[in-house]
Structures are given as C-alpha cells and as structure tokens.
C-alpha cells in the first residue's frame, strides 16, 4: 500500500476545515501545532487557508501520561502561544493520531493556559489504533497498519510520509 501525498491531503483538509469553521460561524481561529510534525502540518494548512495570523506551538512532553514508561523526549522545547487561549476558537493540529494520548496531553496543557471557546482537532493521518475516545474534526486520511509498522512525517519542506518497520529495526 502506498502512502498518500501530504500536500494533496492538506489541500483537501483546508476545504474541509473551511466548511467546518463556517458551519460553526468561526471567523478568526487560532492555529496551534503539536511539535514537531503537527507544527509543519499547521503551517501548511494555515498557508492553504490564506491565514497569516500568528501560530502557536505546543510541546506536550511534560503532559504525557506515559512519561514514566517512555521517558522524556531528548529535545524538549517550551510551548509558545503568541495569543490568549481564554475564549478563543482554537484549531489544534497534529500529524499522526495513534493512541490519542498526545491529543489528551495537548488539551490538558491548553486548559492550563485558559478556557478556549472551542477546540477543533485536525490530523493529517489517523492510524485507527485509538486507546482514548478522541477523533479529529478534520482528517486527511485513515491508514491501517500492521502492529509492527509506523508512519513518520518528514519535513518541513517538502512534507513526506515514510513507513517504518519496527520489526526490522529491533533485529539490528
């Protein structure tokens, strides 16, 4: 199975997001990307939407509930939100939705900054492996992978998807 082209997915996601926001009468959303791939997707999506407003970035490393199992990512950086969260309509963007734990961590962090009016979740890919009841409002594509496979977004320019085989990596 070949992987979809991120640029094609983002073009369609922009159409879908525009419709989603219009149905809810949201005219000035604030974009937030989850590091690192979610930031790249958010930048491309915001550009496709013709929106040049400041974008926020979240690093959810300290908010993950699997921190004690997986350890801390070696490149933790501070989150940057150049706008108030309180009362804002947020578009939260991630590259790959797998378990849902990253999104849960992102929501926890966002609520530490204030209470948003709404949060629209946008994901490039859903791997249909959810452990939590989290589903995106706007989605590029759903992929079904074998248990030993993962998908990684590379970028920032151009954005590309690559399949990774964890079984072959552990054999090394």
Swiss-Prot record:
Substrate binds at residues 36-37, 77, 94-102, 151. A motif (PRPP-binding) lies at residues 90-102. GO terms for biological process: regulation of DNA-templated transcription. Pfam families: Pribosyltran. Keywords: Glycosyltransferase, Transcription, Transcription regulation, Transferase. GO terms for molecular function: uracil phosphoribosyltransferase activity. Belongs to the purine/pyrimidine phosphoribosyltransferase family. PyrR subfamily. Regulates the transcription of the pyrimidine nucleotide (pyr) operon in response to exogenous pyrimidines. Also displays a weak uracil phosphoribosyltransferase activity which is not physiologically significant. This is Bifunctional protein PyrR. It comes from Pseudomonas putida. The gene is pyrR.
């Amino acid at each position: 199975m070949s992987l979809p082209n991120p640029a094609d997915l983002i073009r369609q996601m922009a159409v879908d997001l525009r419709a989603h926001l219009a149905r809810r009468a949201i005219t000035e959303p604030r974009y937030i990307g989850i590091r690192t791939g979610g930031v790249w997707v958010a930048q491309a999506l915001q550009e496709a939407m013709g929106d040049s407003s400041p974008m926020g970035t979240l690093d959810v490393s300290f908010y993950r509930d699997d921190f004690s199992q997986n350890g801390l990512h070696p490149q933790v950086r501070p989150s940057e939100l150049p706008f108030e969260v309180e009362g804002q309509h947020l578009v939260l963007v991630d590259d790959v939705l797998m378990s849902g734990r990253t999104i849960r961590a992102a929501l926890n962090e966002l609520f530490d900054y204030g209470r948003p009016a709404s949060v629209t979740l946008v994901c490039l890919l859903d791997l249909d492996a959810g452990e939590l009841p989290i589903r995106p409002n706007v989605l590029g594509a759903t992929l079904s992978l074998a248990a030993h496979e993962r998908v990684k977004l590379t970028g920032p320019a151009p954005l590309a998807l690559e399949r990774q085989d964890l079984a072959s990596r552990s054999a090394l």
